[in-house]
Each structure stands twice: as C-alpha cells, then as structure tokens.
Amino acid sequence: MNKEKVREYFLSKPGATEEKPFNIPVPVFKVGNKMFGLINIHEPDRPSINLKHPKDKIHELRSVFKDIKPGYHMNKDNWNTVYLDGDLEEDFIKELIDISYDLVFSSLPKKKQKEIMN
C-alpha cells in the first residue's frame, strides 16, 4: 500500500481532516481535532504510518508482525509505526487504520460524535 492510497483511506473516514501542524511537512490525520494517524517522512525509502492502538493489543501487534514497531517519535504505550512496504496486506493495514480511528472517535464527547456522523 503506498502513501497516496493510505492518505485517501485516512480521509475516507467520517469527519477525518488532514493537517500539517509540525515544522516539517508531516501529514497528520484527525477526527474531532484528535490525531488518529500520520504519514512518516523520516525514512523516505521505507514508507510508514503511525497509528494509535489499544494498550492491551499494542505489544501483541509488535510481537506478531515484524513490520509493526513502537511509534516513531510518539508515546510507545499508545502508538505503533506500521511499515507499508513489508509483508502486511493492504486490507490488514486498513483494519489497523480503522482500529486507530475507532479508538479516537470513541473517546470524543457524544455530542461531537453525533455532529461528525450527521
């Protein structure tokens, strides 16, 4: 899965927005003004994304899949870096994005969730 396909998938999520809030051109994807993913640029030859995952699953994902590592420049207890050029199938990468989105979306106030879904 390439970066452009990933970007399109991030933006297909309800209420998703793209920002570049840092001093470098890192695309950050948010829902309800909370980040659920970003596209890394630190390794130009190795495309990757950072995703938020549940604390009870984060270490399991890293131990089972060699292309999932602790989140680069992120809180390692909440974020994983997912490499796009390895053995992970496109559908599985989308599932990981869905998990991140759902985790962040569910943390939003109910009023904000309703606004996004309407």
Segments from the language model and where they lie:
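Charge-dense, helix-prone N-terminal extensions
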Residues: M1-N118
